[in-house]
A protein has these predicted regions:
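Residue-level detector of beta-strand face positions
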Residues: 7, 30, 219, 402-403, ...
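Active-site metal-binding core of divalent-cation-utilizing nuclease and nuclease-like domains
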Residues: 379-430, 434-436
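Extended, highly charged accessory segments
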Residues: 1-12, 19, 24, 52-375
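Short beta-alpha junction loops
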Residues: 58, 426-427, 440
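Short secondary-structure junctions
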Residues: 41, 60-65, 251-260, 387-403
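Metal-dependent nuclease catalytic cores in nucleic-acid-processing enzymes
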Residues: 8, 439-440
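Short peripheral tails and domain-boundary helices/loops at the edges of structured domains
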Residues: 23-51
Length: 440
């Protein structure tokens, strides 16, 4: 709400945040991991941690792009000329701002107080209670503004940041406007700023806004179903879990926040997808642990309630609908609605609940074995499509055999007289002609 350039409306006036009080602000350089959620102040990085991420060992940890400046602040200032601030409520002049936001979550293994896994080797699923997790809520700048594309926690996005004067905190929009790029009036300073008459940009500080807080949390592994793990599967399952919480505990869960988290798999290559539920009350209320401590049956009951509600929803009588606001569309993150569907939610829940459900206690769900070499449903579909090409359109016979390739599960594919190795999620580097280590 208090980000630079955001607008406030009251008493038929519109004012825009154009300054941060630097007396009540602090900025510090952090290094971000491109693959996992880990971040660390530059000054706190030890010598042996400079080349690879201390958490996931990512080789991109030391890239210059992973070093960014974060700013925490307590007060902003909005100044607008009287005439320019006046608006007419009869006209819809409200123009909302959208920002590149990302929540990074870190916790120690010892913080996992209780963890359960489903005793189905072919269906990896489980959940755990985390007594203390550290959250970093970061605003990387306005959407659609130009800036560098940076990968953080497996998400590659344009992150323009905010440019401000490092002394007076005035917002500098000059860099984002081609029309006034050379105009002297483009520089913005407070009247008493020592850089007011500066002819260069030495006073510019490019920052990302952040806040840190700690709370208790619950983490649920998204099931690796027969359909794989795709955005529709993830978002539909989040919607089902949120619905299950509401049905099980009523309106007493309004302070809980639901989000998606994906991390690199430290057991095998690929990524793991989780639903993260955290208490919006800093420090936590003890509510999550109270709800699901001691037994996994509460989670089972929650899943059953969600399944029964969705399958009995009246929208099943309307073939053109794949969900409604009485079932999965109650999901709060409206920007993900396109990926939420009744059929996807039912497919996941049905696989979890079919046959007898047995639970087993584990140290953490991070240890649950999954076939993470197939990092997405798209990769699985690609392999399935290869098999279906046999003897079609003049192609020779195609045979695929599961095999261990370079120490992990892969495939040998025979196409006529030719034979190829398929190694999922292979790391490419200089030996393969790739300058920056990455996975295709």
């Amino acid at each position: 709400e208090f980000a630079p350039n955001n607008r406030f409306y009251a008493n038929q006036r519109r004012v825009e945040v154009d300054q941060i009080n630097m007396d009540l602000a602090k900025y510090i350089s952090y290094r971000f991991c491109s693959e996992c959620h880990y971040l660390q102040p530059i000054d706190a990085i030890h010598q042996d941690e400079k080349l690879n991420c201390p958490k996931c060992r990512s080789a991109q940890w030391n890239d210059s792009a992973q070093k960014q400046t974060l700013l925490s602040f307590s007060q902003v200032i909005a100044t607008t000329e009287d005439a320019a601030s006046r608006i007419d409520d009869s006209a819809d002049e409200r123009d909302p701002k959208f920002y590149v936001r990302q929540m990074l979550v870190n916790f120690e293994r010892e913080a996992v107080r209780e963890a359960w896994k489903l005793k189905k080797e072919d269906l990896p699923f489980g959940f755990e209670f985390i007594s203390k997790a550290d959250f970093s809520d970061i605003n990387f700048g306005e959407v659609n503004r130009p800036g560098p594309e940076i990968s953080i926690a497996g998400s590659s996005r344009v992150r323009p940041g905010f440019r401000i004067c490092k002394q007076c905190g005035k917002v500098q929009n000059r860099y984002f406007s081609q029309d006034d790029i050379n105009a002297e009036s483009s520089w913005e300073h407070a009247i008493d700023c020592t850089y007011r008459d500066s002819n260069d940009d030495s006073f510019i500080l490019n920052v990302h806004l952040y806040r840190h807080f700690s709370s208790e949390a619950m983490r649920i592994l998204v099931p690796y179903t027969k359909s794989g793990v795709s955005d529709p599967v993830i978002q539909s399952f989040i919607a089902a879990i949120q619905l299950g919480f509401k049905l099980k505990f009523g309106g007493r869960v309004d302070h809980l926040r639901f989000s998606e988290q994906n991390t690199p798999d430290l057991i095998a290559d690929g990524r793991r997808h989780y639903i993260l539920i955290h208490d919006s009350v800093p420090g936590g209320t003890g509510y999550l642990h109270q709800l699901l401590s001691g037994t996994a049956e509460t989670m089972l009951d929650l899943l059953k309630k969600a399944y029964n509600h969705i399958i009995d929803c009246p929208c099943k009588e309307e073939p053109e609908k794949d969900g409604c606001y009485r079932c999965v569309y109650q999901y709060r993150l409206s920007r993900q609605m396109d990926n939420v569907s009744r059929s996807s939610a039912l497919e996941v829940l049905k696989e979890l609940l079919e046959n007898d459900v047995e639970w087993e206690k584990v140290e953490t769900i991070s240890d649950i074995q999954i076939n993470a070499h197939l990092d997405s449903a798209l990769e699985q579909m690609f392999l399935n499509s290869l098999k279906k090409l046999t003897r079609k359109n003049g192609l020779p016979s195609i045979r695929m055999i599961q095999e261990i390739i370079n120490g992990k599960t892969g495939y040998i594919i025979e196409i006529g007289d030719q034979c190829y190795n398929i190694e999922p999620q292979k790391m490419l580097g200089e030996d393969e002609g790739v300058s920056i280590k990455s996975k295709p």
